[in-house]
Amino acid sequence: LPTQLSIKPHETVTWINEDRGFHTVTTGYYDTPDGMLESDQIAASEKFSFTFNESGEFHYYCRLHPWMEGTIIVS
């Protein structure tokens, strides 16, 4: 996924783990997760999808690798 992605409300984003390690998708920042989105651990070759229904900018990161982050812009 690019570090920034623009979508329209009610569109779904799918994260695909193309890595051998586990990852998560968590909205907010490492020191202040916002509780809106918290995936389980995503294993290698697995996918996680989420539909963004509201407009806004949603920062996300991986709880296991907090330097892996991005922003979904919904407008």
Q: Positions of the model-derived regions?
A:
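Extracytoplasmic copper-binding redox domains, predominantly the cupredoxin/blue-copper superfamily
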Residues: 1-75
